[in-house]
Amino acid sequence: MKKFDKSIAAFEEAQNLMPGGVNSPVRAFKSVGMNPLFMERGKGSKVYDIDGNEYIDYVLSWGPLIHGHANDRVVEALKAVAEKGTSFGAPTEIENKLAQLVIERVPSIEIVRMVNSGTEATMSALRLARGYTGRNKILKFIGCYHGHGDSLLIKAGSGVATLGLPDSPGVPEGVAKNTITVAYNDLESVKYAFEQFGDDIACIIVEPVAGNMGVVPPQPGFLEGLREVTEQNGALLIFDEVMTGFRVAYNCGQGYYGVTPDLTCLGKVIGGGLPVGAYGGKAEIMRQVAPSGPIYQAGTLSGNPLAMTAGYETLVQLTPESYVEFERKAEMLEAGLRKAAEKHNIPHHINRAGSMIGIFFTDEQVINYDAAKSSNLEFFAAYYREMVEQGVFLPPSQFEGLFLSTAHSDADIEATIAAAEIAMSKLKA
């Protein structure tokens, strides 16, 4: 049995200092019924907690660390930049270099604005869509998380297409009423929503692969249908690629599925592990953003040289061949997890998109949030705790996916499959 004495003591102290003892809710490990692990360091595919336990890491800081922890090239570049100054409140050349890379690789982006988080990116993109179209309402999908902006913290009421209800205290109902929510992968509900509210819908915002109900890829024709509906109704299509951007493919989710939106939101990978976000799209739309246009958005640390450097050094190491290798590794892990679950007759459904993998403990095919919620959460929690004992660090929620990095070796994946085999053999009864 692993010992977690130092993590337990650190969490006891933290609960007197921060809400719930953490700075982001999922880190409290509540849904898996254990004390959170306090991490001390990471290198490559491994992380080490303050009690000295080693884990193969599939959290990767919730996705950004596509080259694993403390990538040598990123670390050395950050050291060099930090010695010159961490932020200037003035433009730097590294902003140009990262912007150029993003524009070259993301099909929809002709002009890009750097911000400090994925939430900033989505909030800013919504403001831009509303300002550009002169419309008020947005359409999002149940179970898709786009950051904690008021307009996006909305859940569905009853009915096929509903005006939203706040998903958190503090979100005014008046704000929520401008958010329409429908089921992910349900194109007919989208069409119905446009029949009801189309003249006032500014945009659809969607993850090309839903990542906060587990990993849920789009059904064939779904993204293409959204593109068609928005074009027919004069609304914008926004892809939230904070999670999928440079994760599922060299050209992001839009390249992976061959559908080009009007605006794209990015984050995670483009910061190489530092706080970052970005939104971009057609030049005609992006030129409406201040100072070239009237739609305001600003940020004290936007485009700071540390985040831009980490992002640039991360992206330049990614090539089309990188994603061929990701696909091979991810297929290997997916097949191994499936084989272990089948061997022990454990109800399961595995979804994958590139190097994102989600395993659901349910018999249902998971294509939307309702299906994801059919998962056996008690079983997942027990599985999670056993995987920790076996030295594998997974996202502590059934509704989050696993991420692979270039640092993960075949030996890591084989060890993970062996750990899952042990965990499932213990839990099958």
UniProtKB/Swiss-Prot annotation:
UniProt keyword Cytoplasm present: yes
The gene coding this protein: hemL2
Quaternary context: Homodimer.
Stated family: Belongs to the class-III pyridoxal-phosphate-dependent aminotransferase family. HemL subfamily.
UniProt enzyme class: isomerase
Cited Gene3D superfamilies: Aspartate Aminotransferase, domain 1, Type I PLP-dependent aspartate aminotransferase-like (Major domain)
Pathway the protein takes part in: Porphyrin-containing compound metabolism; protoporphyrin-IX biosynthesis; 5-aminolevulinate from L-glutamyl-tRNA(Glu): step 2/2
Native organism: Bacillus mycoides (strain KBAB4)
Domain of life: Bacteria
GO molecular function, one term: pyridoxal phosphate binding
The protein's Enzyme Commission number: 5.4.3.8
The UniProt record lists the keyword Cytoplasm: yes
Protein name: Glutamate-1-semialdehyde 2,1-aminomutase 2
Compartments where located: Cytoplasm
GO biological process, alphabetically ordered: protoporphyrinogen IX biosynthetic process
UniProt modified residues of type N6-(pyridoxal phosphate)lysine: 268
The protein's required cofactors: pyridoxal 5'-phosphate
Annotated catalysed reactions: (S)-4-amino-5-oxopentanoate = 5-aminolevulinate
Keywords attached to this entry: Cytoplasm, Isomerase, Porphyrin biosynthesis, Pyridoxal phosphate
Gene Ontology CC: cytoplasm
Classification via Pfam families: Aminotran_3 (PF00202)
